[in-house]
Regions:
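Nucleic-acid nuclease catalytic cores
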Residues: 86-98
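Short acidic, S/G/P-rich loop/turn micro-motifs used as interaction or catalytic elements
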Residues: 9-11, 66-72
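A short, highly charged nucleic-acid-interacting micro-segment common to nuclease
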Residues: 1-16
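A short, Lys/Arg-enriched amphipathic alpha-helix followed by its capping loop at the start of a domain
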Residues: 13-26
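Conserved catalytic cores of phosphodiester-cleaving nucleases, focusing on short active-site segments
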Residues: 51-53, 60-67, 82
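Active-site metal-binding core of divalent-cation-utilizing nuclease and nuclease-like domains
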Residues: 5-6, 26-56
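Well-ordered, non-membrane alpha-helical segments in soluble/globular domains
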Residues: 73-81
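A general structural motif
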Residues: 1, 58-59, 89-91
Length: 98
């Protein structure tokens, strides 16, 4: 069973629509710190990524997505989200416009 955690239900629905395997996935919003599964707490300890995909409560993927061109402050504010998942050896994808 896949679980999709997100800061935003629109993002979660977008991700869920990417693959038929996710059609029965449970979607949950990332809660405030201290109110999530322990693995979610580890992943969000620096900042909250757009998508966290779990299978049997084990992290499979972290996704960060932006429509803005990666210049200025936008890239920097997203780095903590990406760095933490990489530190935890979780595959990580960053989608952005070019």
């Amino acid at each position: 069973m896949y679980n999709i955690y997100s800061d935003n239900l629109i993002e979660a629905d977008w991700f869920k629509s990417l693959n038929k395997k996710f059609s029965d996935s449970k979607v949950a919003l990332i809660k405030s710190r201290g109110n999530n599964l322990p693995i979610i707490e580890k992943i969000i300890s620096y900042d909250r990524p757009d998508i966290i995909l779990l299978k049997n409560n084990k992290p499979l993927l972290v996704v960060e997505k932006t429509r803005e061109v990666p210049t200025g402050h936008n890239v920097g504010q997203r780095m903590a989200r990406l760095v933490r998942s990489v530190e935890l050896n979780i595959p990580t994808i960053f989608f952005f416009s070019i």
